[in-house]
């Protein structure tokens, strides 16, 4: 009997270790480089393309640009069935929210994206710059209009833009603009477990305030009391919630004026606000790059402090510890089921970070999950209920990006426009690498030579040199990994007799470099150490 109990305990322990090893948060950090033309993930993870700007929707319209909040809205708390609600951060009441049906094919381990339709905001006169957002416990999505538009085109007494906007994904319906929550440059919001309390911040350099809203009824946000955070002193870790008048249209339109008069603390550009695993409120500040947190005590706040400072951090990569600058622009936040805080960055290198729950200033615990495509800002971030799949988007990547990479379905992806993907560990998403489509064969005819230097290369970056290269003329470059698969392509422009190769390999090894120019082809090898 003792052996049986010990065996059961050991079995449960081993199962726990296995589940932890399969958590999305288990990875080795990527190298902290600047942006490249592709998405660089840890070798343990992969992605699937879901949507890109210009895709055709079910009604014949095309998917709008500027994807931001990327919300997986589950059906009945399932992790394999739900909706993808995608914000489009476009100004002048021309923004939008597109909702897709999503279902996970468990046999092939890929997401099937179906029926995509835009939500009709004509009843509200449109929606302007819907940025980040939050998923309510009752399954609706609340988006933040990240702009104040003081016109009143529909003559309802409220400004046209600058509100929290609630929608329902299941039937693609606009529900309401939440007037009583006040007019501000909204980013996102998060609803507490009591189904009545909502937190958010203003993404405003001059009026970067933290707000709390207490609805009059559970699941009904149309009416309620509004509060703003007033710090007890400039360096205090305590603060007080001061009620903001919101009884009239004028009061709702002008909450910033009142907040300034009562001394609300300006954090200068608040991005996402999230509730942590132990009830603390976390929020990101864009211009400082910091992540703050506090405990809400009802009428007051305690333990207001900086959780992540904008400084240098040691990152454990496959090649050892490298120091990385955190930088400004901490933006979208989300917690996984291991209590790690995921941080998407809008600014500096636009990285995707993960902060472990045991992180402190004295003993930092920060990982770098991904580097992003040239020009892109990573946006969105939401998880399935089991936290196995992460949904996110890339806003405004450079249209000059030409590098192609394969997603888990074998689809060739170029990050040259607004793009939405799902990410997971490889054991849960897609085919094995041996099942992936193979690239075109390399022709036998070699018609010119070129030189590569440095070779070997420590980073993958190199200069190609040939007398055939002409100033201002484009050269087609393809890189093949040791398995023979294309891992990088580029249409580079010669600066004379030389062309730059900005290749970021995922692993060390010998890579084949193919160059095509005016019907001629050259081949060489690059050693990455």
What are these regions (language model features)?
Residues 12, 140, 163, 197-199, ...:
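A general secondary-structure boundary signal
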Residues 22-437:
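Sequence/structural signature of beta-propeller domains
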Residues 1-22:
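Bacterial Sec-dependent N-terminal signal peptides
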Residues 444-453, 457-529:
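C-terminal outer-membrane/trafficking sorting elements
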Residues 440-442:
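Ser/Thr/Gly/Pro-rich low-complexity, disordered linker/stalk segments of secreted
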């Amino acid at each position: 009997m003792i052996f049986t109990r010990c065996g059961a305990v050991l079995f449960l322990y081993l199962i726990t270790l296995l589940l932890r090893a399969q958590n999305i948060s288990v990875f080795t950090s990527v190298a902290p480089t600047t942006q490249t033309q592709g998405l660089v993930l840890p070798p343990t993870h992969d992605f699937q393309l879901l949507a890109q700007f210009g895709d055709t929707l079910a009604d014949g319209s095309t998917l709008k640009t500027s994807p931001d909040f990327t919300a997986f809205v589950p059906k009945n708390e399932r992790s394999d069935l739900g909706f993808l609600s995608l914000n489009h951060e476009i100004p002048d009441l021309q923004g939008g929210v597109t909702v897709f049906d999503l279902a996970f094919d468990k046999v092939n381990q890929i997401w099937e994206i179906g029926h995509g339709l835009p939500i009709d905001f004509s009843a509200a006169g449109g929606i302007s710059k819907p940025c980040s957002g939050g998923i309510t416990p009752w399954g609706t999505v609340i988006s933040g209009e990240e702009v104040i538009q003081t016109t009143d085109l529909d003559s309802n007494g409220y400004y046209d833009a600058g509100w929290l906007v609630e929608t329902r994904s299941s039937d693609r319906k606009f529900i309401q603009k939440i007037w009583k929550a006040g007019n501000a440059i909204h980013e996102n919001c998060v609803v507490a477990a009591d189904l009545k309390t909502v937190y958010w911040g203003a993404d405003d350099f001059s009026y970067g305030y933290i707000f709390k809203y207490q609805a009059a009824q559970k699941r009904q946000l149309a009416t309620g009391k509004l509060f703003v955070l007033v710090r007890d002193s400039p360096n205090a870790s305590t603060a007080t919630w001061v009620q903001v008048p919101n009884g009239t249209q004028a009061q709702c339109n002008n909450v910033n004026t009142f907040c300034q008069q009562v001394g609300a603390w300006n954090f200068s550009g608040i991005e996402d606000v999230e509730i942590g695993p132990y009830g603390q409120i976390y929020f990101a500040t864009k211009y400082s790059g910091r992540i703050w947190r506090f405990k809400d005590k009802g009428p007051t706040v305690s333990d207001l402090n900086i959780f992540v400072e904008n400084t240098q951090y040691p990152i454990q990569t496959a090649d050892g510890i490298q120091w990385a600058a955190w930088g400004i622009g901490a933006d979208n936040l989300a917690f996984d089921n291991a209590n790690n805080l995921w941080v998407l960055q809008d600014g500096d290198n636009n990285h995707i970070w993960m902060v472990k729950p045991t992180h402190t200033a004295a003993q930092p615990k920060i990982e770098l999950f991904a580097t992003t495509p040239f020009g892109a800002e990573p946006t969105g971030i939401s998880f399935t209920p089991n936290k196995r799949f992460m949904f996110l988007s890339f806003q405004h990547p450079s249209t000059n990006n030409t590098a192609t990479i394969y997603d888990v379905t074998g689809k060739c992806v170029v990050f040259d426009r607004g793009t939405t993907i799902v990410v997971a560990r490889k054991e849960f998403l897609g085919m094995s690498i041996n099942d992936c489509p193979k690239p075109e064969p390399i022709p036998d005819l070699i018609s010119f030579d070129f030189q590569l230097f440095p070779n070997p290369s420590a980073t993958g970056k190199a200069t190609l040199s040939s007398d055939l290269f002409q100033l201002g003329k484009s050269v087609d470059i393809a890189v093949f990994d040791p398995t023979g698969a294309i891992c990088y392509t580029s249409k580079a422009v010669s600066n004379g007799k030389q062309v730059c190769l900005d290749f970021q390999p995922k692993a060390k090894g010998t890579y084949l470099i193919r160059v095509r120019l005016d019907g001629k082809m050259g081949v060489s090898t690059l050693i990455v150490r």
